């Protein structure tokens, strides 16, 4: 049986519901939305969809698979019959759009072509049959520009410059002011551009145009911006895009025509208004709205234009309600009005901010559309981070330079940069950047990702900048027409103020205001809506959530966000403070044990005070403290000048310091003299740390604070190491408890971060009371990859399909995960109730689902990621219980 590659709108694979997962994989997001709207009885221009799998086949051979040409031809013939027009006819031509449509929405990342089928002769026929020459030549020049850019590879700016030249010649400020004759001049200029760039005339055969356009959409699946978007959003590079060939309807035939984009609820806040939310442009085509080249009008103004527009508004109101009821979600829709008749072009679950996501989930639950569990499954856990962004200090009164459209909420402070690639460079240097553009385009995606905020002079709520910024959770102010941006001089002028690249500004994505300089921000808190989601999450999750915290402040912040303990307290971070680094260096540079103990006695009070603060902050929650992990050379200066300064401060010879640094240097420190190896060779270091932990525990215990210290031994690979360190801890504990006249409960466990430790887990568990996985080092040692050097090749590995995602971001379930399962089974075969957690930074939802399934007790993350982990753990529990 041959594989079917083309479906006419309304048809679905195996007659499945249009919103089924099978249909999404075959027809793509746009394809299933068109099929669904037809089945719902909505006005949709007819057409057909070429499947996502066909794109995958095309990528392998760069040619159409056998049978595709015949399927396209038969569906094109059916379209001609239903529309009563002929493709390629010069008197009344059937014109089509060719659009991409992947299974997962990738707004603006791939290519679109409108008005395909026009040529030098059929444009005259279109003018005659419509009686509107201006419309015909406007459609032709749009088609030539899109086709030239997408299919012929001609720089988009060349067409824009030619258009601007004609507008300047005739004194026209906007595109709609151009007459039919003037637009015909634009078309002639475009013909010359095509000949100059390709050596050939602009393609005149509509069937050739269609084949080239379909190929271009297939190829756009692998363009750099699309690949970057998929990598940023962890999307499968192998799913391919569908191609939708759809009969054209025109929003540029006059003032009773137009095009628009709407949302059934506000994509910024989630609010459901009494009026329709969205934007539209009269006498325009669809790309005009999302491109942000013209600033559109609010949809609620539509019924005030005239009776025809009011009728469209009323029909659109019914469609809003029907679509939201069908999707049970906030819907993003696109439409065109042609000579007063409404046509629907697309509907899909809309991109939204984290604030809107939470508000919509809660409201739909209140409205009876969703259960709590269903509402939680609509939450993207990573977008919870947006609630934790800083906001501007209300006590500060900044200088307001101007105002644009508040396109994506938040507060962003950074230096101005006009170039997306330069933004990436500055971000690499640690600078916070406001990407400042006339308007953004899909090519800007990497710069937008690295910027802290986005400012555009053109565009509206539904422009590319706004949609992508909301999807990324970036602060964005769009359509700030007070901004004059000059890329050549790298300047931004607002009123009488002139700014150059590198100057600081601040933007408020909630109000749309632009402020002078760097405005002070304050820390966020838990809102009522977020608290509701947290309460729901805590009701359904099984995994406990701990935090990584090295200071009392970090511990207090994590408790505020709901942390149920500390999963990793890194003691080495405490030694880098200015008031203790010298004592640490004295200890390292000591020539014998006695001198080392003297230096360690100086460090003991510092460590004890740190632990007192942390124990008080956690008040009864478990605190997992890792003994010294990094090699000693990391605490010493590496340059000659700094070594000389240290020698002077310690009253030692420079040569002595330099030789000691050289002695401690390691060829491969990750696998060298670190962790448990330090504790066994220099037991006095571990003894000091254990004493500090347990003395602090005794002190706070006497003050009435419940304390649960957990002492973790890092980087071990054998039960022998565990036995030696367990005995050391018990020996120090006995001494401390005798001195303080009291005891506290404590546990001794280990960090599982080497493959051999996973294999030997049953034996290690004979002494270790708990395990905590260190997934960073376990990933490094399993793959044989240094995390610090992986950036040189992991992106290429992802491009080539060797990795689907970065294994240091999303846990490798097949390799590292298999070792973890082995360790869990081994550990619990010895201790059936063994507590097992993870102390690497793990809030990736896919990783948390896996960790839930293999039976971990807790995960741990940075303080500000605790709410994210709480939600991800709840989603994991719901999915596991419902086999999703």
From Swiss-Prot:
User: What would you give as a GO molecular function for this chain, any one?
Assistant: kinase activity
PROSITE patterns, A to Z: PEP_ENZYMES_2 (PS00742), PEP_ENZYMES_PHOS_SITE (PS00370)
Which residues are Mg(2+)-binding? Answer: 753, 777
The modified positions for Phosphothreonine read 462
Q: What EC number(s) does the entry state?
A: 2.7.9.1
> Domain comment?
The N-terminal domain contains the ATP/Pi binding site, the central domain the pyrophosphate/phosphate carrier histidine, and the C-terminal domain the pyruvate binding site.
Protein's name in the database: Pyruvate, phosphate dikinase
Lineage of this protein's species? Eukaryota, Metamonada, Diplomonadida, Hexamitidae, Giardiinae
